[in-house]
């Protein structure tokens, strides 16, 4: 999940140079290159969306300086953009079914990591919205957990959220 435009420009430069090297050493003209995936989306509120225009401008500049002089123009460029196409458009709707008050405040949901694996598997961040309290102060700190008996079944750890009620 990369948000830095320079990452993609650096990747394109490496691939374009490889295309030129293959042509020079093997006499093979590459018809396309695949920049792969990784084009990110902001998961956290403080993250900024990657500028596609900036990424395209940087890649175009590198293309014009490497591919065109090497006689490989036109070179098709593919990109696997699954995350920006699908990532921002899914919602997991859950209900708080219990609370536990010990050394931390826990909120248990009727969902589990079988419904959304990324937080439990990689500790990835996903925004949590408390329905009807979108503009309320986030003055409570919760561990939001799933319904499996599994220590990694967590949606959020020590997350500032509005007060969550059961139901």
Residue ranges of predicted features:
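Charged (often Lys/Glu-rich) extended helix/loop segments that serve as interaction or gating elements
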Residues: 58, 67-68, 72-166
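Active-site loop/helix belt of alpha/beta enzymes
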Residues: 1-100
């Amino acid at each position: 999940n990369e948000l830095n435009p320079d990452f993609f420009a650096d990747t394109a430069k490496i691939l374009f140079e490889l295309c030129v090297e293959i042509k020079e050493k093997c006499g093979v003209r590459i018809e396309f290159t695949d920049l792969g995936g990784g084009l990110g989306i902001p998961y956290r509120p403080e993250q900024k969306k990657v500028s596609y225009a900036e990424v395209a401008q940087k890649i175009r500049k590198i293309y014009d300086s490497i591919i065109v002089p090497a006689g490989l123009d036109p070179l098709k460029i593919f990109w696997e953009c699954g995350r920006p196409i699908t990532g921002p458009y899914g919602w997991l709707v859950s209900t708080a079914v219990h609370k536990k008050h010990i050394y931390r405040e826990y909120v248990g949901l009727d969902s589990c990591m079988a419904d959304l694996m990324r937080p439990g598997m990689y500790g990835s961040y996903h925004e949590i919205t408390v329905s009807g309290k979108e503009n309320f102060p986030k003055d409570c700190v919760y561990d939001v957990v799933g319904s499996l008996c599994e220590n990694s079944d967590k949606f959020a750890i020590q997350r500032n959220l509005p007060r969550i009620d059961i139901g």
